Regions:
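N-terminal amphipathic/basic-hydrophobic helices that include classical n-h-c signal peptides
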Residues: 1-28
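A helix-coil-helix interface module used to build multimeric assemblies
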Residues: 25-223, 230-245, 306-307, 317-321, ...
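Short beta-alpha connecting loops at secondary-structure transitions
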Residues: 47-51, 96-98, 304-324, 346-361, ...
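Alpha-helical transition-metal enzyme core signature, strongest for iron centers
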Residues: 60, 105-108, 153, 157-160, ...
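A short, charged helix-loop
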Residues: 243-259
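A conserved active-site cap/scaffold subdomain adjacent to cofactor or substrate pockets
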Residues: 262-295, 304-365
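Long, amphipathic alpha-helical stalk/connector segments used for oligomerization, subunit docking
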Residues: 328-412, 420
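C-terminal alpha-helical interaction appendages
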Residues: 379-449, 470, 482-486
Length: 503
C-alpha cells in the first residue's frame, strides 16, 4: 500500500480532482471538518455558548469560583494564585490541550495540566472529580441555551400573534385529510399552530424554572473529598456548594445524585425543544401545501433562485428547512431517550459521546429552525384573489353541515338529511371531475330534493353567509392574542428580537 505524501491526497469524482488541506494529526484527513448545524444555521449567540474555546473559559471560571469559595471558607489558597489563574483564564490553546489529552487519554486531566502550567500554580480541582467540572459547566451551557431559546420563542409567538390578527377575517377553505372541509380564516389557522407552540412554551418555562444543577458532589455523590478538605465540617461543604451554585445562576440543585445527574433531565430538555419545534413544523408543512394551491407563500427575495433548471420555480425552501430541522430534533430525542433510564450504579462515561453530539446539536437545530421560521413569518404573504376563487368553487360543499343543521331544525331527521346531502354532494363532485358540469350546482340539486325542507333562496342564503362565516374563529383568535400579549409583556427583549440573515 502506497501512502500519498502529506497534502497530496486527492479525491477523484467524475475526473475532477479536489485537493485536501493537510491535517497535522493525520495527513490523510482534511484539516477541519465543520459542524454544519453550527456553521450554516445557528446564530452567533448559540455558537459562542457551545464553542470549544468558550467551554474551556467557562470551565476555568468555574474552577476560579470554586477556589475563591474554598479560600473564603478557610482553605489555604493564596490570593496571588487565584490572580494568576484569572490572568491566564482567556489564554486558550486547543492544540496544546489536545496534545496533552493524547498522552493522558483524559480530557479533564489535560485541561487541569494546561491551566496549572499557564498560571504556575496547582490549586484548582481540589476535592473535585471530573464530573464536578464537566456536569456543572455542561448544565450551564444548557441553561443559557434554554434562556436564549425562550427569548426566540417569544419572538416567534409575537409574529404569530401579528399574523393571526392581520388575517383574522380572511376566510379560507379549511382542509381535513387535505380535502376541503368547512370555512375557517387564515388567522385562525395561524392561531391554531401558534397555540400548539404556546403550550410547548409553557413547558419550556417550567423546565427553566425547575432546572436543577448537579453541584459539587464528588466522585460518587457523597461529597466525601470536600468533607475531607474541610475536616468533616458538613456546613462548610454545603456553604461551598451554595456559593458555587450561585456563581452558575441556576434555580435549584440536586441533592441525591451519584457521579452524574440523571440523564432523564437531558431527555426532558431535548423533549421540550422537539415540542417547541412541532407547531412551527406543522405550520410550515401547511404553508407548503398552500403554496402548491397558490393561496399563500413564504415569500421570494429579490435575486432568489428557485431552481437551477426551471426558471419559474418559487419553492418553499425555508419551510422545507424547518421541517428538516424537526426531523433532526426527533433524531436527537431518540438519542436522549436511549440515555434516560440507562444509568449503571452511580454512573459512567458511556453517555459522554452521545451527549457531546446531542446537546449542542439539538440547540443548534432549534436555533436554526427559529431563525428560519422567523424569516418565514416576516416574509410570508397570502393571496386573497386566489383564495376567493377557491372558496367560490368549494363554498356549497363547505356549508353542507350548516345546511344539515338547518334541515334538522326544520324537522328532518339528522341521518335522513345527511344521506340526502351526501348523495348530491358526491354526485356534484363526480360531475365536476368528469367535466359533465363546470358549475357547482349543489344548491339547485338540494332545492329539488323533497327530503330537504329548504327552498333555493334559503339554501343560497346559507351558502352566501359562508363567505364571511367562520364560526367562532374571531373570538378564538382574540383569546390567542391576549395570551401572547401577556407573554410579550413578561419578555419584551424576546418580543423585539429580529433574526439574522439566513442562507
Amino acid at each position: 500500500l502506497k501512502i500519498p505524501a502529506p497534502g497530496t491526497l486527492r479525491i477523484n469524482v467524475t475526473r475532477i480532482n479536489f485537493p485536501l488541506p493537510e491535517n497535522p494529526l493525520c495527513p490523510l484527513l482534511p484539516a477541519v471538518i465543520p459542524n454544519v448545524l453550527a456553521e450554516r444555521y445557528a446564530s452567533p449567540a448559540l455558537q459562542a455558548i457551545w464553542s470549544a474555546e468558550g467551554r474551556i473559559v467557562l470551565e476555568r471560571e468555574f474552577w476560579i469560583a470554586v477556589m475563591k469559595a474554598q479560600r473564603e471558607l478557610g482553605l489555604d489558597i493564596p490570593e496571588e494564585a487565584i490572580a494568576a489563574y484569572e490572568k491566564a483564564k482567556d489564554s486558550v490553546d486547543p492544540g496544546s490541550i489536545m496534545a496533552r489529552e493524547r498522552v493522558t487519554r483524559h480530557d479533564v486531566k489535560a485541561r487541569i495540566e494546561e491551566f496549572n502550567d499557564l498560571s504556575g500554580h496547582e490549586h484548582i480541582h481540589k476535592g473535585m472529580t471530573s464530573r464536578d467540572l464537566t456536569e456543572n459547566v455542561e448544565q450551564l451551557q444548557v441553561y443559557r441555551s434554554l434562556l436564549a431559546i425562550r427569548d426566540k420563542s417569544v419572538a416567534v409567538l409575537h409574529r404569530l400573534r401579528c399574523r393571526a390578527e392581520q388575517w383574522a377575517d380572511l376566510v379560507i377553505t379549511a382542509r381535513t385529510h387535505n380535502v376541503a372541509a368547512q370555512p375557517t380564516t387564515l388567522g385562525k389557522r395561524i392561531a391554531m399552530f401558534g397555540e400548539e407552540m404556546l403550550s410547548a412554551f409553557h413547558a419550556l418555562e417550567d423546565v427553566i424554572a425547575r432546572y436543577p444543577v448537579r453541584g459539587l458532589k464528588g466522585a460518587v455523590g457523597t461529597q466525601m473529598d470536600q468533607l475531607s478538605l474541610f475536616n468533616g465540617n458538613a456546613e462548610q461543604v454545603l456553604d461551598l456548594e451554595k456559593r458555587v451554585v450561585n456563581h452558575l445562576g441556576m434555580p435549584c440543585v440536586w441533592t441525591n445524585v451519584g457521579q452524574v445527574y440523571p440523564r432523564s433531565l437531558d431527555f426532558r430538555v431535548v423533549s421540550v425543544l422537539t415540542d417547541l419545534a412541532s407547531g412551527p413544523s406543522s405550520f410550515c408543512r401547511t404553508l407548503r401545501l398552500m403554496a402548491g394551491h397558490e393561496t399563500a407563500s413564504e415569500g421570494f427575495a429579490p435575486g432568489q433562485t428557485g431552481s437551477s433548471a426551471m426558471p419559474h420555480k418559487m419553492n418553499s425552501r425555508s419551510c422545507e428547512r424547518v421541517n428538516g430541522f424537526h426531523v433532526i430534533l426527533k433524531g436527537y430525542l431518540a438519542m436522549a431517550s436511549g440515555l434516560a433510564g440507562d444509568q449503571w450504579n452511580e454512573g459512567d462515561v458511556s453517555c459522554s459521546v452521545v451527549r457531546r453530539v446531542m446537546l449542542p446539536d439539538a440547540f443548534f437545530a432549534i436555533d436554526g429552525l427559529f431563525e428560519t421560521y422567523l424569516t418565514v413569518l416576516d416574509q410570508m404573504d397570502a393571496y386573497p384573489a386566489v383564495i376567493g376563487k377557491e372558496n367560490a368553487h368549494y363554498l356549497p360543499f363547505l356549508m353542507t353541515t350548516t345546511i344539515m343543521m338547518e334541515a334538522v331544525k326544520a324537522g328532518v331527521g339528522r341521518e335522513t338529511a345527511h344521506k340526502a346531502i351526501k348523495e348530491h354532494a358526491v354526485a356534484t363532485v363526480n360531475d365536476l371531475r368528469a367535466g359533465k358540469t363546470t358549475v357547482n350546482d349543489l344548491v339547485a340539486r338540494l332545492a329539488n330534493d323533497e327530503r330537504i325542507p329548504l327552498d333555493q333562496a334559503a339554501l343560497a342564503a346559507i351558502v352566501a353567509e359562508g363567505e364571511s362565516n367562520a364560526g367562532a374563529a374571531r373570538a378564538q383568535i382574540t383569546h390567542f392574542e391576549r395570551e401572547i400579549n401577556a407573554i410579550e409583556k413578561r419578555y419584551p427583549k424576546g418580543a423585539a428580537y429580529a433574526p439574522g440573515a439566513i442562507l
